[in-house]
Amino acid sequence: MGLLDRAGARLTGRPKEAEVLVVNTCSFIDTAKQESVDTILEMARLKTSGSAKKLIVAGCLVERYRDEIRKSIPEVDAVVGTGELEAILEAAGVAPAPAPASPFNILSGTSSAITLHGKESLAGTHKHEEIAFRAEGDLRERQGRFSREEWQGAAHMLPTYLYDESTPRFLTTPRSSAYVKIAEGCDHPCSFCVIPNLRGKFRSRRFESVVAEVQQLVARGVQEITLIGQDTTCYGEDLGLKDGLALLLDALASIEGLRWLRFLYAYPNRITGRLLETIAKHDNICKYLDVPLQHASPDVLKRMKRGAGADIFLKTLEKVRTAVPGIALRTSFIVGFPGESPSDFQILEEFISEARFDWLGVFNYSDEEGSGAFLLDAKVPKRTIDSRQRRLMKLQQSISKRAKQQWVGRELVLLAEGESEETPMLWEGRTQFHAPEIDGKVYINDFGELESLEAGRFYKAEITEAHEYDVIARVVSGPL
């Protein structure tokens, strides 16, 4: 959208008004594919009856079903894969605008800009002198990843695109928050996952590029940054950086005006002591960690090509909670993976009871063509999968309610997000223990001495009531 906006296209969220319809798709699991296809068909019908002259399909679905989309849906005029971002302009019939000077060049003369191209660039950078560069090239430990040999023959077909700080962005998030992608692709060969086929080999953005983009966003008024990637904890390893994510967090946390900084999707065996120390020492790094574990049974995890098990995970969680007291932990699991026996499920159930996650998601196994698990036998019946999913969510509901009850009486800083969708009598907000969009909500029913609140501002509030996933709060002071 940023490229289209910079080129002069007028963007609208109302499909009936558009001359060019763009459907950005996902194809990670069956439900995402179905939603994408349904939306494409809906836009195809709109194209034939409305003012739209072109229909473009973009994103992951194109990487998996490019030819099928073209053949099956003749209303589609163009397809744009995940590695073909620039092609959106030609597909939409929009002339590209001249690229402005790199925002990083503007920042390069300031003390807050960090340039790390090699060892020689570290001269005079006292704060970051501990950064250790390895030899050129990808020297990461195997850690269950695809080897160079396994990528041979496929690399030329995989996406390689990686945006940088000069790529124009059109923010669709609330004005106070933004996501920043620090890496693309994944090298982990998880047998249930097709992301490596859709997104390509793991590749990190340049350190200084991420810093520059966050500086730009904060200068525009963004106060909360969420770092994302398919595997954020491996950030920088392909660039030769050791503890790259910890170093990046250290640098970003020093940016004046950044109130909250968090990252999502930590691979469990990449959570280092240095990373935890960094989270603990900065007040503006949210005490929040999202670690998708996928299962707890060693047998299931082995078939998933992930390894470890409940005992190892419990030790990891203990290490995290000791290093960062009060941290909120989120995870996700897959039920119904091929071969998941009743005893495997029992191991998972008992692990969840003992681990006591603050937030938890349970996904039904999706049998994806092209994944390693697609070829496995001993498929679990859908009825059994649904039953197991409901059982785990009921268990987590009770765990979550007990955890939220511990919040009652505490005063926490929250970000006000606006009137509740349920009723204008309530406002919604989040604490540092809530990631955007995926966790519960804080409902504000008492503004204290204030007549009104302002979306995008921070307030101190007392938690007065707890439910399974949500809490009720009254404002004590602010805006902060």
Where are the regions a protein language model picked out?
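Terminal RNA-binding accessory module
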Residues: L375-L480
